[in-house]
């Protein structure tokens, strides 16, 4: 089956910290995952693009049909550090397996850079 649904977990997000500001956390959109529409579908592909980012991308999923903050759990994480040039300019994807009803993306400790996008497809 080809993937035909592409949803934005986190749109372009920019933070140009000159060193005088504190890192902060960004939570993206809550979107329906594959199991929301397709019942037993458990394969999702998450793609993302960073430009000079320092922060931690966390993909979360939930099995709840009306999720509260306590219903979310981490399903994937990648750290980026612009100072050390570790994943700071990364364009990548990963396949995630799970019967998630909803998914969302977070950038924790966002200290600098541009998150161009974080998307899920199924």
Segments (PLM) and residue ranges:
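Short, surface-exposed beta-strand/strand-loop-strand elements in extracellular ectodomains
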Residues: 54-74, 117-121
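N-terminal non-cleavable signal-anchor helices
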Residues: 15, 27, 32, 54, ...
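Beta-sandwich interaction modules
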Residues: 34-41, 74-122
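Structural beta-strand segments of beta-rich domains
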Residues: 42-46
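Extended, surface-exposed interaction regions
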Residues: 47-50, 96
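Transition segment at domain starts
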Residues: 1-41
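Residues within well-ordered beta-strands of beta-sheet-rich folds
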Residues: 47, 60, 104-106
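Extended, low-complexity, turn-rich repeat/linker tracts enriched in Gly/Pro/Ser/Thr and Asp/Glu
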Residues: 49-57, 110-114
């Amino acid at each position: 089956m080809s993937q035909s649904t592409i949803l934005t977990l986190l749109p372009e997000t920019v933070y140009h910290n000159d060193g005088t500001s504190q890192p902060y956390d960004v939570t993206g959109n809550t979107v329906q995952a594959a199991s929301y529409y397709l019942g037993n579908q458990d394969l999702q592909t998450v793609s993302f693009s960073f430009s000079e980012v320092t922060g931690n991308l966390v993909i979360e999923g939930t099995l709840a049909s009306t999720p509260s903050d306590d219903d979310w759990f981490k399903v994937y994480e990648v750290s980026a550090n612009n100072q050390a040039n570790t994943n700071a300019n990364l364009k990548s994807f990963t396949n995630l397996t799970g019967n998630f009803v909803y998914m969302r993306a977070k950038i924790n400790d966002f200290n600098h850079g541009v998150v161009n996008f974080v998307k899920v497809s199924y």
